[in-house]
Regions:
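Bacterial C-terminal helix-turn-helix
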Residues: 37, 46, 52, 236, ...
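Conserved RecA-like P-loop NTPase ATPase core
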Residues: 23, 45, 68, 82, ...
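Small-residue (primarily alanine) positions within well-ordered alpha-helices
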Residues: 31, 51, 104, 151-152, ...
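Short gly/ser/thr-rich secondary-structure transition/capping motifs
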Residues: 88-95, 131-136, 159, 276-277
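Nucleotide-binding/hydrolysis machinery
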Residues: 1-21, 29-32, 36, 58-63, ...
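Conserved post-Walker A coupling segment in P-loop NTPases
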Residues: 12, 25-91, 102-118, 146, ...
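AAA+/SF3 P-loop NTPase mechanochemical coupling elements
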Residues: 66, 96-106, 110, 118-124, ...
C-alpha cells in the first residue's frame, strides 16, 4: 500500500545528480525517526514532495498527511486553522472547528512558509512539539495530539533569530535535522531527465501516441536557462511547449518560456544572438550561464568527444573536465 501511494510522487522525485541522491538518502534515514524535520529550499524545488516522502516512509504512513501554507492566512486565521477554535470564540464562529493538528493526529503535519508565522503561533508550536498538547482558540481544555511536524521555508531562520523575528528555542526543536534541497540549476544532469518525463506525461494527458523528443536547439534552451522557479517552472514550461507543439511528428523545437509574448522565442532573451541582456543583472549568474552554454555547445559540436570539445574552446582536457565538474555537466 505504501509503495502504491508513493508512486504518485515519484515522477517529480526523479534525479541522478549527486546532490539530489544525497537528499533522498538523508530522507530515507530520517523517515523512521519520530522527530521534527526542517526542509529548506527555493520555490518549486519540491519541499512538499519531500515531506510526503518522509511521511510515507515512516511508521505513520497509514495516518493522515495534512499540509498548510502559513503565508496564505493572516495571523488570526492561522492560529485558528492550526489549533482549531471553540464555538463562539470570535464573531462568526458558530460551531467548534478542529484545527490541522487535530486532523493530523497519528500522522504528519506539513507547514510550508513557516518563517511567516507570528510569534504567538510560534510559541504554541513549541508547546505542541515539547508536550504534545494544545488548546483551541477560545478554549481552556488542553488537548493531546500525536503529530510529526515537517516544516519548510526558504528564509534564513538563524538570521531571523538574530533579528528577533523567529524564536531560537523553536528553531532548536525543529532543526533535529535540516534537509537542504538543491535548486534545479545545480542539478544540470537532471534537467533533461525531468523534461522528458514531464513531456511524456503531457502527451498521455493530451492523448498523443508518443513524444517525438526535443531538438538540439530545444535541449540547449532547457539546459541554458537558469530556472528560477525550479522543477515547478520546468514542468509548466515543458507541458506548455508540448501542448503548443501538438501532434506533430517532428522533434519539439520551440520552448515557450514566456507565454505572455506574442511570438514565442525558443531561447532565453539573455542567450539569444549577440544581444546584451537588460540591466540590472547578476553578472556572476550571467557569466556562469554563458559558460554553461559554451560548454554544452562545444560538447554537442564535438559529438560529446571531450578532447575535441576542449580543443574547440582552447582548453586542455583537464581544464575542460574541471569546468564540466563545476557545472555538473
Amino acid at each position: 500500500m505504501a509503495k502504491f501511494i508513493m508512486a504518485q510522487y515519484k515522477d517529480n522525485l526523479l534525479g541522478e545528480a549527486n546532490s539530489f541522491l544525497e537528499v533522498l538518502e538523508q530522507v530515507s534515514r530520517l523517515a523512521p525517526l519520530d522527530k521534527p524535520v526542517l526542509v529548506i529550499g527555493e520555490r518549486g524545488t519540491g519541499k512538499e514532495l519531500i515531506a510526503n516522502r518522509l511521511h510515507y516512509l515512516s511508521a505513520r504512513w497509514q495516518g493522515p498527511f495534512i499540509s498548510l501554507n502559513c503565508a496564505a492566512l493572516n495571523d488570526n486565521l492561522l492560529d485558528s486553522e492550526l489549533f482549531g477554535h471553540e464555538a463562539g470564540a470570535f464573531t462568526g464562529a458558530s460551531k467548534r472547528h478542529p484545527g490541522r493538528f487535530e486532523r493530523a493526529d497519528g500522522g504528519t503535519l506539513f507547514l510550508d512558509e513557516l518563517a511567516t508565522a507570528p510569534m504567538l503561533v510560534q510559541e504554541k508550536l513549541l508547546r505542541v512539539i515539547e508536550y504534545g498538547e494544545l488548546e483551541r482558540v477560545g478554549g481552556s481544555q488542553p488537548l493531546q495530539v500525536n503529530v510529526r511536524l515537517v516544516c519548510a521555508t526558504n528564509a534564513d531562520l538563524p538570521r531571523m533569530v538574530e533579528e528577533g523575528h523567529f524564536r531560537a528555542d523553536l528553531l532548536d526543536r525543529l532543526a533535529f535535522d535540516v534537509v537542504q534541497l538543491p535548486p534545479l540549476r545545480e542539478r544540470q544532469s537532471d534537467i533533461m531527465l525531468l523534461a522528458n518525463q514531464f513531456a511524456i506525461q503531457m502527451c498521455r494527458e493530451l492523448g498523443l501516441p508518443l513524444f517525438p523528443g526535443f531538438s538540439e536547439r530545444a535541449t540547449a534552451t532547457l539546459l541554458g536557462y537558469r530556472w528560477p522557479g525550479n522543477i515547478r517552472e520546468l514542468k509548466n514550461v515543458v507541458e506548455r511547449s508540448v501542448y503548443r507543439h501538438g501532434d506533430s511528428e517532428h522533434e519539439l523545437d520551440a520552448i515557450i518560456l514566456n507565454p505572455f509574448r506574442q511570438t514565442a522565442a525558443s531561447v532565453p532573451e539573455a542567450a539569444s544572438g549577440d544581444e546584451l541582456p537588460a540591466l540590472p543583472l547578476d553578472l556572476r549568474d550571467f557569466q556562469l550561464q554563458q559558460e554553461t552554454r559554451l560548454l554544452q555547445r562545444s560538447l554537442q559540436q564535438a559529438k560529446y568527444h571531450q578532447k575535441q570539445a576542449a580543443e574547440l574552446l582552447g582548453l586542455t582536457y583537464h581544464q575542460l573536465r574541471a569546468l564540466l565538474k563545476k557545472h555538473q555537466l
